[in-house]
Amino acid sequence: MNMIEALLSMRVLFLTQVFGIFLCFPGLTKAGHLHYHSSIEVVIPMKVTEKTRGMNLPNWISYSLKLGGQRYIIHMKIKNLFLTRHLPVFTYSDQDSLLEDYPFVQDDCYYQGYVEGDSESLVSLSSCFGGFHGLLEINNIVYEIMPKKFSRKFEHLVYKVDINKTESRGSSLMQDNITCQVELQKSGNPILKQSSFEDWWTHTKIVELVVVVDKTLYDHYGNYTVMLSDLYSVINIVDTIYEVIGIKILLVGVEVWNKKNLIVIDDVSKSLRLYCRWKASNFLHRLKHDVSHLFIYRHLRGLSGIGSTGGICDPKRSCAVVTFIDRTLNLRAIGVAHHLGHNLGMKHDEDICKCSYSKCIMHMDSPPIPKFSNCSYNYFWSYTVKNTRCLMENMYTKDIFDRTRCGNGVVEDKEQCDCGSLRNCTNDLCCMSNCTLSTGSSCAFGLCCKNCQFLPSGTLCRKRDNICDLPEWCNGTSHECPDDAYVEDGIPCGVSAYCYEKQCNDRNEHCRQIFGQNAKTASVHCYREINTKGDRFGHCGLQGPTYIKCKSNDALCGRIQCDNVVQIPNMKDHSTIHFALVKNVSCWGTDYHTGTSLTDIGDVKDGTECEQNHICINRHCVHISTLDSNCTPAFCNYRGICNNKHHCHCNFHWDPPNCMIRGHGGSVDSGLPPKTNKKKHFFYLLLLQLIILACLLSCLLWLLFNIKGSKRKPQVQPTPVKTKKVSKKVPSQKPSPVPSPSLPQLRMPSRSASPTSSIKSTN
């Protein structure tokens, strides 16, 4: 066997906006061991007892403290809307049994507020351990405050964050910057200012967050109570940061890996992939949530973490991994907020992105800045507001807060709706300020609610995304669209492709995505030769730092191998293209650097066919029967297709649940499509017949008119024309035979005949 290998390395600058929001690449940021604190002051917060201007509201407290020679008045109120009622905490026993507990959570020691005289200020503090700990932003200066240990005078240490140590580098491409600014301003979703951001929608969006603490972070704390308190403080700061853009962060559960890590945590991308997979198969069914973050205490090659971009409403991608090592409480919170921004569809800031600082929270350097840039607002508007249906649904989850209150923007017990503040309620035609529907209104929100009324039954509320997806329709009696349903795993979607997790994975299409439209999957010899080597170009996964060799039966489930590559693609972020010649067959593939932020495009996707009636799952070629299901084509009477909930989605003309009775299609999960109006169809059919009949009558009348007209015309006899006889002497000769005009002249084959002559004359 001849083998020729060529490594083609292409190094390019990683651009976070190459592929767009809907490709959902993970986002990474640099963490480093940066010392942001430039100065320390000792302050004593003094409680203000007199009611200052505008502070006559109940449940508000005020403190005065002196920073940098200037005294500031801080107004705060207790925050009680970021922890669920009866917060569950999961741990493990010595026998690896799952334990569920509901520890006491002190919920009256978390505050949010502002600094008097600074409308852009931000205050997020906690006082659960006898002093204030948290974040202050005053006049575009960020501080971290914490109690001074063993102080009897209520002294606190205030650290001023040195932002200059993270100054962004200037760009010489001024024209490109101007062009990009113009493009952003011309976009359909213009960049909006923070001051008017709250007016974009009526209701607040809620992100239900689950936090998992790995073994290293648990061991670092040692004290279980202090660890949970710090977690709550971090989420408190994150919630305060996101409240500016109309998002509430709700912590709905915590899991602590107190015995051992349940996944392998070595490189960044692999850890994220494994954690997302673990979360989807374990935690998702245990506790409903929108996004889950894994907090660890170890270095990630200079990164603060990694999060799946735009995965907020995808249960298999709504996750992130964040490191807490060598980071203060504020930096931990800002790191969580950064990667949550990726989950919400925000990309890394570029040089054109601006806020009140030189770098903003979504910058790749992960600066200690709690402000979003104009670009982040634009991404949030163009993606999150318009594409995150799950957040709209979670807004109205019942019984999730410690205290119910009309006016908090969340529909709770005994509330028909909640339009939030009085200002918002004046602009809401469906909901009144007392959390009841306005007169004549049937609903106030939801995908099946329009103009305060339920959409009619059969109205499409969620269209079909691809061949492996299924549509959903409103039922006419609810404001909610049915849960997203899709084609059952294992159902064929092509010649050699199967639906799996809502995607139709085909090898040829996979190669075209990497190497262009002419590419196709390579010979099986390429897979068996390369993927059984166990190197970075061919393997079946990683076990620590070692590549796993694919077994011969699993070779087609390792890394993708392609043929018929016409042009080498422009790979990103130091990716390498691999070429080999196996049995005179070209084999093209890629490697993957685990420290990059790009998705590994070279892995064979789960659900890809590897043999007849076999598919790849977790890099193993398994029989399709392993996808156990009670739903079969026979169960649906061969008149429908099974969905992911193992119910029949019937074809048109047949009704669920088993597609036996005549109807209009759909399923018990997705609702029923609109019914066909037989009277309307009959009318259209009758109209078509009348049009055809009218055309025939018109043609008949035209023929009759022409026939009568020809009979009425008089017969005119032609006048004979006198002609002179012309005599000409012609030498006598035998006349040539003239062919009959009624017979066709055939060209007869003749060996001596001229090519241009078909009849021969004789004298």
UniProtKB/Swiss-Prot annotation:
It is a single-pass type I membrane protein. Residues 712-763 are annotated as: Disordered. Residues 1-31 form the signal peptide. Residues 706-763 are cytoplasmic. SMART domains: ACR (SM00608), DISIN (SM00050). The keyword Iron-sulfur does not apply. Residues 201-684 are extracellular. Residues 32-200 form a propeptide. GO terms for molecular function: metalloendopeptidase activity. This is Disintegrin and metalloproteinase domain-containing protein 29. Residues 205-396 form the Peptidase M12B domain. Its main location: membrane. The gene is Adam29. It is found in: Membrane. One of its GO terms (biological process) is proteolysis. Residues 403-489 form the Disintegrin domain. Glycans are attached at N164, N177, N223, N374, N424, N434, N475, N584. GO terms for cellular component: external side of plasma membrane; sperm head plasma membrane. SUPFAM superfamilies: Blood coagulation inhibitor (disintegrin), Metalloproteases ('zincins'), catalytic domain. It comes from the Eukaryota. May be involved in spermatogenesis and fertilization. Seems to be a non catalytic metalloprotease-like protein. Residues 751-763 have a biased composition (Polar residues).
